[in-house]
């Protein structure tokens, strides 16, 4: 069986609220860590979310 191209990653809030999103990432084309600016409902503002491994 072939290795999956897309993997799931956890996007953790940089505001240290403990809130996170789960996103899909193409591991072949996006080799660097994913960073997105999204809404954090705990902090109630838009902050950067950085990629972390799903445990």
Curated annotation (Swiss-Prot):
Give the Gene Ontology MF terms in alphabetical order. structural constituent of ribosome
Q: Which domain of life is it from?
A: Bacteria
* UniProtKB keywords: Ribonucleoprotein, Ribosomal protein
Q: Tell me which Gene Ontology terms the entry assigns under biological process.
A: translation
Q: Name one GO cellular component term.
A: cytosolic large ribosomal subunit
> Which cysteines form disulfides?
none
Q: Which InterPro entries match?
A: Ribosomal_bL33 (IPR001705), Ribosomal_bL33_sf (IPR038584), Ribosomal_zn-bd (IPR011332)
| Signal sequence, start to end | none
State the family it belongs to: Belongs to the bacterial ribosomal protein bL33 family.
Name by which UniProt lists this protein: Large ribosomal subunit protein bL33
What does the organism's lineage look like at the top? Bacteria, Pseudomonadati, Pseudomonadota, Alphaproteobacteria, Hyphomicrobiales
């Amino acid at each position: 069986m072939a290795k999956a191209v897309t993997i799931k990653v956890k996007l953790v809030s940089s505001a240290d609220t403990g809130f996170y999103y789960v996103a899909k990432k193409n591991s072949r084309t996006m080799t660097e860590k994913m960073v997105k600016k999204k809404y954090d409902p705990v902090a109630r503002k838009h902050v950067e979310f950085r990629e972390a491994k799903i445990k």
